[in-house]
Amino acid sequence: ARSILDAVESQDVVTFTGSAVTGRMLKSHPRIINEAVPFNMEADSLNSCVLGEDAVPGTPEFDIFIKEVRKEMTVKCGQKCTAIRRIIVPEKLIEDVQIAIGQQLDKVTIGDPRLKEVSMGAMVSKDQVQEVKERVVELTKTAKMVHGNLDEVSVIGANSKDGAFLAPVLLRED
């Protein structure tokens, strides 16, 4: 990124999405400062999705909620900064939501994204997989894993041991 930033001028705009640490490092680049380059940063977001009490199973709103949560969990392996990290559900609907999301996650196929039957690819690296596993274990100190498995993943068109694959995991905290 440094070589790209060395070429920016005052009429350019730099937009960054990622960690706050990296964003601050980029924003302090001499060219950004000296040329007064506008710098927009979206960092370390914690997005949520709230289900209303009237969005019960069988309603379009419930179906859209489940579809969006599944999509956010699986697009880019859930690793995009704007992904939903937390869902808030009325207590009376927790079981229904948990079951519906689990059913949708059961349909997710993991593997080589070049194959049309694959709906979720690998993470960036095995180090990232390990970090996610460690964070999930930390979260399970207060939340219960209700879907997924950190140690097993079924992969299509690739070797699960060679790639950075991790199945979607759903946690529940009452």
Place the predicted regions along the sequence by residue.
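ALDH superfamily catalytic-core signature
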Residues: 8, 13, 20-174
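Hydrophobic, small-residue-rich alpha-helical packing segments that form membrane-like cores
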Residues: 3-6
